[in-house]
Amino acid sequence: MSASSSKGKGKELATASPLPGPSSGSANPAASLSALWAYLLPALNHIVKSPTNTPDKAPAIDIGFYAGIHTACYNYFTSQSETKSSAQARTAEPSGTDLYEQLDKYYIDAAREVILGAPQDDSTLIHYIVPCFNRFSAGAMSVNRLLNYINRHYVRRAQDEDKGWLRLNDVLESVAKTITADDSREKISERLKEKRTDELKQWGYKPDGSGATMASAEACAEAASPPDRIISVSSLAHRRFRTEVFEPLLAVPVVKGTKAKNKKIPKATKTTGIPLPKGRLARAVKELLESKGGDEEERVRLVRDLAAALRLVGVRPDHPLRKRLDRFLQNV
């Protein structure tokens, strides 16, 4: 074996080393939320935050630890259900609500770490955000598989109870205009289904396409939903990256010197020459797109990855920055 191949193999082994689980003598992780969270947290931190040479692939955990987490989640959900009486079951929150909310808080903190580490220089912002998001998203997808029991047991039940990304109240007003007193329940259900399809089309769903476009569009629609909606574990992470990272970077700064009663941003005119203020990310994109020289292939890659990230976290297709990125990519 050559020195170069040996060196490469050593690096690969170091990168692929899975995280071992806790000692077998540990307390029952399903005994309480605090015990379960203490059991999960090292795995979450390893998958979501550990440094890696391949940002598009999350670090692995030991197969025994992986199986132990599945078992602990199952036992925790089961024990919650068994301890509730029939009367409590009708009024209490579904089992798993506390774990789901704890996971949401975890993603809030993880996303805030990203924004706190952002450079102040606009010229390097996109070079920082794109790999950070790719790493965060890879971890989110890995955690989604690891905690799929939450999706199957808690998220699906919540969606069946009209607590998902699209609720009856969201579509009732528009659908109600076309509903008559003679319409059957099946016909009303079909109208609601059509409304859902229209929403998914905004995120790239093609009715005559593969099921992959449906899954991709629904993931984006979930991430675009308000924080009170129950969505899949991966979309939960992407939604928090939007609320804690992208939205602050997209926010337009308040114009100083304007009167309190007039909060509107002045329009740019040829006579005044006053430019409209832009958010940090918009300024960074402008600088990237208008820069001369440099690595053109790298610039296109950054733009493509940023456009994909904005879509995946639920930034609307009609957002000016998304439209600008799409126009650029159409011409390359």
PLM-predicted stretches and their roles:
Residues 1-332:
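Eukaryotic scaffold/interaction segments
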